[in-house]
Regions:
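A structural signal for short loop-to-beta-strand junctions that line the ligand-binding cleft
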Residues: 77, 85-86, 116-156, 304-309, ...
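Glycine-centered hinge/linker elements that transmit conformational signals in sensory
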Residues: 175-176, 182, 219-255
Length: 451
């Protein structure tokens, strides 16, 4: 059902350009729907409140939809009813779906039409390239941008004679065994849901310079095919992970077992995790008192040269079907959240990174990264910009129905770790099922050229 719904996103969005809610008498109001939940949802609401309190003409009504997936589905349903929000947050995985719908007001055009001058080159290239067209046009505003990092318990590593995090997965395997021998029951905590495909599969391919799919991971055409299963480095890595799991060097942690891997790390129960830099703030607030921990860039595999990791998180899209008065509010809101001072506040209360060079430089001048609890977050920027400008490796993933593709990959991982299925056969099956999804998406947009 979910795949059918997302597969139809283009048709639904492209034909439902109806007018939004009437403007309020005193302030011009617009709706902003976002997918974040929990602590991050509170931080988004605080940002909306700061904007609303900064002036007296506009009001942005910000409403969490509970998840990225729900945010996209609810936006589709709202178009059906002619009640679409002015701003909608769409995750990295949903970028191509909405990009091909034509149901949006391009970010660069919006800001120009509303009288704002934006230095689009100020955005970090690793972030901008993910959301830009082939001509470099920005269709949406990068918002809560992140990448994956390795979190490690420095106290535990000290007990095994180590003062640094593993730089390669081979070194990591040795560290996990040493931690186990030292009495730690959970050297590595991980999960195998569709959410974790991002850091364990996609980011692995990224930092090792390998492709998830042909056609530059889909950036060069809708006829892209998944090929991650044909990468010997990835296959060997998954076999290593399964071996660590079988030998209790790696432990699955999620809500079903009563503790997520992030919670397990913060409690000091597990010593290493891979997760978003966006979790840095939450871990800093919830970590066991006195626990000494840090972050590092993701390990590479063997002798592979390090490449840039992929940006995660989401961007903000302005939807068609609203008045110029409402679009003025949207433009003012985007201008507000782009200020370096706001970037500092946002990065302070979350773990997300500044999306612009100017914001990053402002944070450095303020000494943001000089000490705990924020030290180390700059590694996310280093990870996203590790490759030289001449690097020909893919700089992201642009596949239709990527959420469903991730689900099929997760199903393959579950077969491996839960049912002891063959690694290569399971990855091949996941790729085959994912390619079927891609072909259906391609058929939906037959003869359409990527922007």
């Amino acid at each position: 059902m979910q795949a059918k719904l997302l597969g139809a996103v283009g048709a639904l969005l492209a034909t439902a350009f109806l007018a939004g809610p009437a403007a309020a008498a005193e302030k011009t109001k617009i709706d902003f729907w976002f997918g974040n939940s929990g602590d991050i949802a509170k931080r988004v609401q605080e940002q909306c409140d700061r904007f609303n309190q900064s002036q007296g003409d506009y009001e942005v009504v910000c409403t969490s939809q509970g998840s990225y997936d729900a945010s996209l589905q609810n936006t589709i349903a709202a178009f059906r009813a002619g009640k679409q929000p002015t701003i909608a947050q769409v995750s990295d995985a949903g970028t191509l779906d909405i990009m091909l719908s034509g149901a949006f007001y391009p970010a660069n055009q919006l800001m120009a039409d509303m009288g704002y001058t934006v230095d689009w080159k100020d955005y970090f290239s690793g972030i901008a390239n993910y959301y830009a067209t082939s001509k470099g046009e920005m269709y949406s505003f990068p918002f809560n941008s992140s990448t994956a990092l390795l979190y490690w318990n420095k106290d535990a590593f000290t007990k095994i004679g180590k003062d640094h995090a593993p730089a390669t997965w081979q070194e990591a395997g040795e560290d996990f065994k040493a931690l186990k021998d030292a009495g730690y029951a959970c050297p590595l905590a991980f999960d195998i849901s569709n959410n974790e495909v991002w850091q364990y599969i996609e980011q692995f391919e990224a930092v090792n310079g390998e492709a998830i799919a042909t056609k530059k991971n889909g950036f060069e055409g809708l006829d892209a095919e998944l090929v991650f299963n044909k990468n010997p480095l990835l296959v060997s890595y998954i076999k290593d992970l399964k071996s660590w799991y079988d030998n209790k060097l790696a432990v699955i942690k999620n809500k079903a077992v009563g503790q997520t891997f992030v919670e397990a790390f913060a409690a000091g129960d597990c010593q290493v995790i891979l997760t978003s830099v966006g979790d840095h703030g939450n871990i800093g607030r919830t970590a066991k008192q006195g626990m000494n921990w840090g972050v590092s860039m993701l390990p590479t595999y063997g002798n592979a040269t390090r490449h840039s990791s992929y940006v995660g998180g989401a961007s903000l899209w302005v939807l068609k079907g609203h008045s110029d008065a409402e679009y003025k509010v949207a433009a003012a809101f985007f201008n507000f959240i782009a200020k370096p001072e706001e970037a500092l506040t946002w990065s302070t209360v979350t773990g997300y990174i500044p999306v612009r060079n100017s914001g990053f430089e402002y944070l450095k001048k303020q000494g943001f990264y000089d000490k705990a609890p924020y030290a180390g977050r700059e590694l996310a920027i280093q990870s996203l910009t590790a490759s030289p400008a001449s690097d020909t490796a893919p700089h992201g993933i642009r596949l239709g129905g990527l959420l469903q593709v991730r689900t099929e990959i997760a199903n393959g991982l579950q077969a491996i770790f839960v049912n002891n299925a063959d690694v290569q056969a399971s990855l091949d099956g996941a790729a085959d099922r994912g390619n079927q999804l891609l072909r259906r998406f391609q058929q939906t947009y037959k003869n359409v050229q990527l922007p």
